Structure formats: structure tokens, C-alpha cells
């Protein structure tokens, strides 16, 4: 008999078929307490779990005594209780490599669209305000040869640095847990402490996961240290930034603009002050949202679950020691 798994995110037909070749697949809409209660017998027998954008916590795991592996269609896993999973010897798989280039594209798009005010001036054109040759009130700022500060020099940070260095001749500063020799050799990137990065960068790009240590890492103190002409970009995790402090910094003119793909609460509230600011480009967590990349992530997650339930945890496993 095939192992039973629960799928809580729709998959393309070919990937669903691949999953069904290995498992008995039960599809549910979400992982809410009501859904779990209504499908208690299925959850009690499931050995695998696959999906995204749902919380997997100790309360859910209590309902899934046979669970051996869970696979998320994402690189981030802050909605998973890793300690609870590990304590129960449940493997957690994710998709860290598939989306690197696409998220770096999104970051570069935010850099360009904020600096050149693309969204703002496009809306002005649509509103019929372009009635003569444009003047300084339509101008943006240059990107080329400006200093880019990257906070978090992982795979995505490296891909962003490549674009900025070779495509836009931007000097690169970075702050990370350790020196990154490859970044320094390939892009002439300079490691510095966070305060120095904030003070010297024209663009500050935040690419950090959410952990206890990074929660609200950026607040009023950090924004006050940035140039008044600086542009802040976040495509990591929303709660790494104190959003109220960001709003205040923008309102007071402590920073020039912001390009945001992530927020403390998602979806972003329609009454958020960020949405009324012309110097803010706010997009709905589109970092990896292309047809090609989202398919690749789903395919990777399917393969990850197959591997995990076969005891193969050489790659893409958050807690591989569980398999020891």
C-alpha cells in the first residue's frame, strides 16, 4: 500500500500525477482546525504533507501521529514550528535554489522602479497629467554607479550583487554573519558592519529570513542612520522590519523612498499609510511569482517529499539530523 500524503496546495496536473505515482494523495483546501477536524481520519494516517502558506504547528502535529515529512513550496519556513517538527523526528523540506534568480530580478526591479519613480509617473500619465514636456518634478535618481548595500549575502544576495556590479557598475557593500570570499572576489564587494552600510549606501536591500534574531532588526534607529536620499528595499520577510518605524522614516523624510515586496501582515491592510505614499512601490509578495519559477518550486517540493519519505535528505532539508 502506498503511503498516504496530504496536499494542501493545488499542483499542475503532471506534478499531481507524479505525486500519485508514489503516494495516495488526499487534497484539502487548507490546514485550518475546521478542515483538520472534518478530515480527522485522513490527517491521522498521513505520512507526508505538501503545500504552502499555512501554519504547521504543534497543535496540528498532535493530529498527525504518523507524519514523517513535510514539504513546503517555498524557501522560507517561518510558518513551520521547526522545533516541534524536529522533536517528533519529522523532516522539513524546502525549495531554496529554484527561485534565486527570479527573486534577484524582483529586487532589481524594485531598485529601478523606486529610483526612477516608474509606478508614480506611469499613474500620472494615465491620469492625464502629461500635458507638456516633463520637468524636474517628474525626475527620478540614477541607479548606475550608486552604492548598493546588501544585508544578507546568501544565494539571492549574490545574484543581486551580480546584476548590480556587472549591469549597473554599482559598488557593493554587504553585511552578513560571515565574510563571503566569492562576493569579494567576483564583485569587489566590501564587508562592513551594519551601521557603516546604512550610512554609506544609496540603496539598502534587505534579504534576510525571519528568525528570533532578525525580528524587527530594522527600526527607527536603523532608518535614522541612512542617508536622506537613500532608498530602502525589502524582499526578505516583512517582520524583519518595524513597519511603523519605516512609515515614520518615510513621513519625516529620513529616507527617500521604499520598494517593498513583503510586509508585517500580509495581505497589506488597505488603510496602510504605505499605500498613500507616492514614493513607495508596494507589490504583493511577488518575489518568485513567475509561471516558470512557481512551477519549478512545485516540482522541487514534490521531489523533496518523495526523497524525504525514501530517507534521502542530502539536499533541501532544514533538519537533516532527524534522519540519523
UniProtKB/Swiss-Prot annotation:
InterPro entries xref list: D-isomer_2-hydroxyacid_DH (IPR050223), D-isomer_2_OHA_DH_cat_dom (IPR006139), D-isomer_DH_CS (IPR029753), D-isomer_DH_NAD-bd (IPR006140), Glyo/OHPyrv_Rdtase_B (IPR023756), NAD(P)-bd_dom_sf (IPR036291)
Enzyme Commission identifier(s): 1.1.1.79, 1.1.1.81, 1.1.1.215
pH dependence of function: Optimum pH is 7.5.
Recorded GO MF terms: gluconate 2-dehydrogenase activity; glyoxylate reductase (NADPH) activity; hydroxypyruvate reductase (NADH) activity; hydroxypyruvate reductase (NADPH) activity; hydroxypyruvate reductase [NAD(P)H] activity; NAD binding
Reactions accelerated catalytically: glycolate + NADP(+) = glyoxylate + NADPH + H(+); (R)-glycerate + NAD(+) = 3-hydroxypyruvate + NADH + H(+); (R)-glycerate + NADP(+) = 3-hydroxypyruvate + NADPH + H(+); D-gluconate + NADP(+) = 2-dehydro-D-gluconate + NADPH + H(+)
PROSITE patterns reported for this sequence: D_2_HYDROXYACID_DH_2, D_2_HYDROXYACID_DH_3
One Gene Ontology cellular component annotation held by this UniProt entry: plasma membrane
Subunit composition and interactions: Homodimer.
Sequence similarity: Belongs to the D-isomer specific 2-hydroxyacid dehydrogenase family. GhrB subfamily.
HAMAP family noted in UniProt: 2_Hacid_dh_C_GhrB
Function noted in UniProt: Catalyzes the NADPH-dependent reduction of glyoxylate and hydroxypyruvate into glycolate and glycerate, respectively. Can also reduce 2,5-diketo-D-gluconate (25DKG) to 5-keto-D-gluconate (5KDG), 2-keto-D-gluconate (2KDG) to D-gluconate, and 2-keto-L-gulonate (2KLG) to L-idonate (IA), but it is not its physiological function. Inactive towards 2-oxoglutarate, oxaloacetate, pyruvate, 5-keto-D-gluconate, D-fructose and L-sorbose. Activity with NAD is very low.
Protein name per the record: Glyoxylate/hydroxypyruvate reductase B
Gene: ghrB
Amino acid at each position: 500500500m502506498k503511503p498516504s500524503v496530504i496536499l494542501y496546495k493545488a499542483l499542475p496536473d503532471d506534478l499531481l500525477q507524479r505525486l500519485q505515482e508514489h503516494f495516495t494523495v488526499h487534497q484539502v483546501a487548507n490546514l485550518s482546525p475546521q478542515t483538520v477536524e472534518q478530515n480527522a481520519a485522513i490527517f491521522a494516517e498521513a505520512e507526508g504533507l505538501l503545500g504552502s502558506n499555512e501554519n504547521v504547528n504543534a497543535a496540528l502535529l498532535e493530529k498527525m501521529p504518523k507524519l514523517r515529512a513535510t514539504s513546503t513550496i517555498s524557501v522560507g519556513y517561518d510558518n513551520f514550528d521547526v522545533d516541534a517538527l524536529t522533536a517528533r523526528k519529522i523532516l522539513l523540506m524546502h525549495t531554496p535554489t529554484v527561485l534565486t534568480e527570479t527573486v534577484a530580478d524582483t529586487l532589481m526591479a524594485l531598485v529601478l522602479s523606486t529610483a526612477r519613480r516608474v509606478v508614480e509617473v506611469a499613474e500620472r500619465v494615465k491620469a492625464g497629467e502629461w500635458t507638456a514636456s516633463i520637468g524636474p518634478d517628474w525626475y527620478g535618481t540614477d541607479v548606475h554607479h550608486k552604492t548598493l548595500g546588501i544585508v544578507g549575502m546568501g544565494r539571492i544576495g549574490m545574484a543581486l550583487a551580480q546584476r548590480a556590479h556587472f549591469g549597473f557598475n554599482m559598488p557593493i557593500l554587504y553585511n552578513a554573519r560571515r565574510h563571503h570570499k566569492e562576493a569579494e572576489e567576483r564583485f569587489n564587494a566590501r564587508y562592513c558592519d551594519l551601521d557603516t552600510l546604512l550610512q554609506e549606501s544609496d540603496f539598502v536591500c534587505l534579504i534576510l529570513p525571519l528568525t528570533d534574531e532578525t525580528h524587527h532588526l530594522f527600526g527607527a534607529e536603523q532608518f535614522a542612520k541612512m542617508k536622506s536620499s537613500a532608498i530602502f528595499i525589502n524582499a526578505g520577510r516583512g517582520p524583519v522590519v518595524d513597519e511603523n518605524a519605516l512609515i515614520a522614516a518615510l513621513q519625516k523624510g529620513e529616507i527617500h523612498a521604499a520598494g517593498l515586496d513583503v510586509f508585517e501582515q500580509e495581505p497589506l491592510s488597505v488603510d496602510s499609510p504605505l499605500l498613500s505614499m507616492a514614493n513607495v512601490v508596494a507589490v504583493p509578495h511577488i518575489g518568485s511569482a513567475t509561471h516558470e519559477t512557481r512551477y519549478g518550486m512545485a516540482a522541487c517540493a514534490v521531489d523533496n517529499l518523495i526523497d524525504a519519505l525514501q530517507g534521502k535528505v542530502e539536499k533541501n532539508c532544514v533538519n537533516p539530523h532527524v534522519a540519523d
